[in-house]
């Protein structure tokens, strides 16, 4: 070893070890020193390794996966909601268009207003109501059913009019022919303007029932018209007979025998009046007026002719109460005929014939 006073103790000791082939750690051979004494670890490199390992930890990876899954689920739910809403809106529009198409296809149009022959008109509302739907009493007569899911009596589970599902113990109206069920307010509103099923377009009431109802209404109207106009026609005919008799009685005031012409005229008038009263058909007001004019003309001609061809006795024309009675009966006859024509809607162009 060197002395303590030597400032460089390694100089003398390791001077001989300058050859690195001997594997001695010295100043000149530092590589052998690293083998014997390994260097301490670098703190800078360790920090980088720790940071890289912490950046890719399993917790962070799991958190990222959860967030990504949540984002995917929310996006999927949003897309499905939009698609379903759009589809429901399209179905509602399609149903509304179908209902409008059914309404336009089955909207019955009225016949010609000049058709007065009383034929059966299927476009009229059954029961006498206005419009193309059913009568309120007929709608109320349709069966009402309490809905139960387990019965299986109703095939569908929703109403085709409002597109809402049936609830338990809800009142439904079953159509008689097709057995389709609908909500009571929905189908009642539909049947007020339509007479068929919204789904299958089947008519609620058969055509025979429509014909029976229309025939009954036609008979009622005919009977009412006959009752309202029958009295007027009888009054006119009776007045015609009374007028002819009064004229004959006026002529007979002269205490002279009746000429054959007046007798024939009276017989003809009585026969015409009797035929009008006893006829089983109908009586025309135009014919009545025409016969009245013919009677007046024949009575005037017969009277003048009988006066001219008499034996020199000139009977003055009827005057006083007899003339006033004749004129009064004629005026009353004309007024009664005109009133009958007004009440019955008489038209000379159409020449309607009133029932007796």
Curated annotation (Swiss-Prot):
GO terms for cellular component: membrane. Pathway: Protein modification; protein ubiquitination. It is found in: Membrane. SMART domains: RING (SM00184). It catalyses: S-ubiquitinyl-[E2 ubiquitin-conjugating enzyme]-L-cysteine + [acceptor protein]-L-lysine = [E2 ubiquitin-conjugating enzyme]-L-cysteine + N(6)-ubiquitinyl-[acceptor protein]-L-lysine. Residues 261-273 have a biased composition (Basic and acidic residues). InterPro entries: ATL1/ATL16-like (IPR044600), Znf_RING (IPR001841), Znf_RING/FYVE/PHD (IPR013083). Its EC number is 2.3.2.27. PROSITE patterns: ZF_RING_2 (PS50089). One of its GO terms (molecular function) is transferase activity. Belongs to the RING-type zinc finger family. ATL subfamily. This is RING-H2 finger protein ATL51. It comes from Arabidopsis thaliana (Mouse-ear cress).
């Amino acid at each position: 070893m060197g002395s303590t006073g030597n400032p460089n103790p390694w100089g003398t000791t390791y001077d001989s070890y300058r050859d690195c082939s001997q594997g001695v750690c010295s100043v000149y051979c530092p590589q052998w020193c690293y083998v014997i004494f390994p260097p301490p670890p670098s703190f800078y490199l360790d920090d980088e390794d720790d940071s890289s390992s912490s950046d890719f930890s399993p917790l962070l990876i799991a958190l990222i996966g959860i967030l990504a899954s949540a984002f995917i689920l929310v996006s999927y739910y949003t897309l499905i909601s939009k698609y379903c809403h759009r589809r429901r809106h399209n179905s509602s529009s399609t149903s509304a268009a179908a209902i409008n198409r059914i309404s336009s296809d089955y909207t019955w149009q009225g016949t010609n207003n000049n058709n007065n022959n009383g034929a059966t008109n299927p476009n009229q509302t059954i029961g006498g109501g206005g419009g193309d739907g059913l009568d309120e009493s007929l709608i109320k007569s349709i069966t009402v059913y309490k809905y139960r899911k387990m019965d299986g009596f109703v095939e569908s589970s929703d109403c085709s009019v409002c597109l809402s599902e049936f609830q338990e113990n809800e009142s439904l109206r079953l159509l008689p022919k097709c057995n389709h069920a609908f909500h009571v307010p929905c189908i009642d509103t539909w049947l007020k303007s339509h007479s068929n099923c919204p789904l299958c377009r089947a008519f609620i009431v058969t055509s025979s029932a429509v014909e029976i109802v229309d025939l009954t209404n036609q008979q009622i109207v005919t009977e009412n018209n006959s009752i309202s106009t029958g009295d007027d026609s009888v009054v006119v005919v009776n007045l015609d007979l009374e007028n002819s008799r009064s004229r004959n009685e006026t002529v007979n005031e002269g205490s002279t025998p009746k000429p054959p012409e007046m007798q024939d005229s009276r017989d003809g008038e009585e026969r015409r009046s009797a035929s009008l009263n006893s006829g089983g058909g109908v009586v025309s007001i135009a014919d009545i007026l025409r016969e009245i004019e013919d009677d007046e003309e024949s009575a005037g001609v017969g009277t003048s002719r009988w006066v001219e061809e008499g034996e020199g006795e000139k009977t003055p024309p009827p005057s006083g109460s007899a003339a006033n009675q004749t004129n009064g009966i004629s005026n009353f006859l004309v007024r009664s005929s005109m009133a009958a024509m007004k009440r019955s809607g008489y038209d000379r162009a159409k020449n309607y014939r009133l029932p007796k």
